[in-house]
Amino acid sequence: MRGRRGDRMTINIQEHMAINVCPGPIRPIRQISDYFPRRGPGPEGGGGGGGTGCGEAPAHLAPLALAPPAALLGATTPDDGAEVDSYDSDDTTALGTLEFDLLYDQASCMLHCRILRAKGLKPMDFNGLADPYVKLHLLPGACKANKLKTKTQRNTLNPVWNEELTYSGITDDDITHKVLRISVCDEDKLSHNEFIGEIRVPLRRLKPSQKKHFNICLERQVPLPSPSSMSAALRGISCYLKELEQAEQGPGLLEERGRILLSLSYSSRRHGLLVGIVRCAHLAAMDVNGYSDPYVKTYLRPDVDKKSKHKTCVKKKTLNPEFNEEFFYEIELSTLATKTLEVTVWDYDIGKSNDFIGGVSLGPGARGEAQKHWNDCLHQPDTALERWHTLTSELPPAAGAYPLA
């Protein structure tokens, strides 16, 4: 609109923006139910009450609306024949899946874990890939002594290992109470290795001599950082959580330092106890090279004269030594019932005190498998009984009072 010279020109906003402000025809808003077929109250395929059958769709629906809800969300259907423990959480599926087999061989006291492959792992490196490997721990009692590890696969989010890791000395008590922790990590040569995800499998899910297949999504359970990398406040929280975990697991929980295979037999002909030191497995590493130089000592207590000590030879640079040595204690069966056999494993060091790795006591005051092994030996003379035992970090009473050499 133009005015005369000198007059103020007025233009309304509608004319300036050329917008038609008149409302058009009001159309009904579609509801979400309009995009999906409705099941009628009648039998399937029939339309009772005018409802749309399950197999029919209204002609006005777009192709996107005809797709099933799972296709709209990008979901996939797992294979019917595979044994899959699936998770619906996006946080878990984003980490990837791990496929593996577990087999508990009760006769040989071995737990076999075959790591097959992983799929869709979370990228951890700048190139959008990862360098994944798998490590195993047995809980409770996770430590370097019972850690097993696969090889590292380079630059892949879908690694294939097909690698078998084996735990020796697994007892029925372990199967009842322990949990296998399977962690997938990314190896980084320039900094610390990064945690991707983990799976925890209670061993009680396994049946003896029956292989069980798993294909499970990784879970986001990042382990606590090391004390050196934490502030004072975080260290306090870490200590509190560890104390809480120990309280939940029960009092008197000791750190596991490996396993030892012992043979006991009372000889009625020789009137004495035969103690066989067969082998050890998954010993704790005491040297800077990641190994130990282990040997085994045995005592039959109480030992007033200190003459009951026996010692095996030293095995160099190994965490799984084989000894196959036998010691004999001349003693009557009635007296043996009041004694305690203490077996300790040590790391030999030149020029300094030897390091205690772990020990186990068998006798009337023992518990669990150690007590059962001792009682079976007393009640089954002239029979060699081999059993695996867990070595713990606590030094048996008065064991340190004897020379370590």
Curated annotation (Swiss-Prot):
Listed binding positions for Ca(2+) 3 are 287, 347, 349, 355
Keyword Calcium assigned to the entry: answer is yes
One Pfam family from the UniProt entry? Answer: C2
What domain of life is recorded for the organism? Eukaryota
Give tissue specificity per the record: Brain and mast cells.
Show the SUPFAM superfamilies listed in the entry: C2 domain (Calcium/lipid-binding domain, CaLB)
Q: Mark out the compositionally biased spans (Gly residues).
A: 42-54
Q: Where is this region: Interaction with UNC13D and DYNLT1?
A: 1-94
CDD domains in UniProt: C2A_Rabphilin_Doc2 (cd04035), C2B_Rabphilin_Doc2 (cd08384)
Amino acids binding Ca(2+) 2: 287, 293, 347, 349
State where the protein is found: Cytoplasmic vesicle, Secretory vesicle, Synaptic vesicle membrane; Synapse, Synaptosome; Lysosome
Q: Where is this region: Interaction with UNC13D?
A: 220-405
Membrane topology, as annotated, equals: Peripheral membrane protein
Xref: InterPro entries: C2_dom, C2_domain_sf, Doc2, Rabphilin/DOC2/Noc2, Rabphilin_Doc2_C2A, Synaptotagmin
Q: Which residues form the C2 domain?
A: 94-216, 256-389
> Which GO cellular component terms, listed alphabetically, does the Swiss-Prot or TrEMBL entry include?
extrinsic component of synaptic vesicle membrane; glutamatergic synapse; lysosome; neuron projection
UniProt function note: Calcium sensor which most probably regulates fusion of vesicles with membranes. Binds calcium and phospholipids. May be involved in calcium dependent neurotransmitter release through the interaction with UNC13A. May be involved in calcium-dependent spontaneous release of neurotransmitter in absence of action potentials in neuronal cells. Regulates Ca(2+)-dependent secretory lysosome exocytosis in mast cells.
Q: How does it assemble?
A: Interacts (via N-terminus) with UNC13A. Interacts with cytoplasmic dynein light chain DYNLT1. Interacts with UNC13D.
Question: Any idea what this protein is called?
Answer: Double C2-like domain-containing protein alpha
Please report the organism this UniProt entry assigns to the protein: Mus musculus (Mouse)
Task: Point out the gene that encodes the protein.
Answer: Doc2a
